[in-house]
Amino acid sequence: MNAQLFNLESRLDELENEINTQYCELDTNLDALKSNRIELESQLEKFESSLTNRLQGSISNNCRNDLLNLGYTHSQVDCMSDEEVYAALDKIDEEIHNTDQDYSTGFEDLEKQIIEMKRDYFIDRKERGSGNFDEAWEGEILDLEFEYTVLCLEKGLEPLNYIITWEG
């Protein structure tokens, strides 16, 4: 019986050593996982920062291009900081908003009608071929544009370029 008890105690010691060894391995693996997590979080922060910088540059470039498209010169835009570019666009947006509020629904209706007629005209022209289009479209659109321009001038407002630009 003492031999069996001794064998059981030996086996218990072996199991205890195995458990301690596995515990140490798990502890080491857990430390490695924590270290990997910290490294991944650091890389994620760097990636997010890089992405933000790229997007910011892209947004800044797009805003600068918008100013160029709105009539600013390259020299004007090049010397502006990003904040000045954004401020200029905000000012333009505010002016457009104020101008939009000055337009009556008659203006908006005329603008929509002109745009829709131009769209229909070009669809009609495309379907008939570039050389064969109904010249009546041209007259109707020009009449509407004239009416729109007169309304703008009567109110002392500047007609919107995309409405009155016509290449028939």
Swiss-Prot record:
Residues 1-53 form a coiled coil. Keywords: Coiled coil. The keyword Coiled coil applies. This is SPbeta prophage-derived uncharacterized protein YonX. It comes from Bacillus subtilis (strain 168). The lineage of its organism: Bacteria, Bacillati, Bacillota, Bacilli, Bacillales.
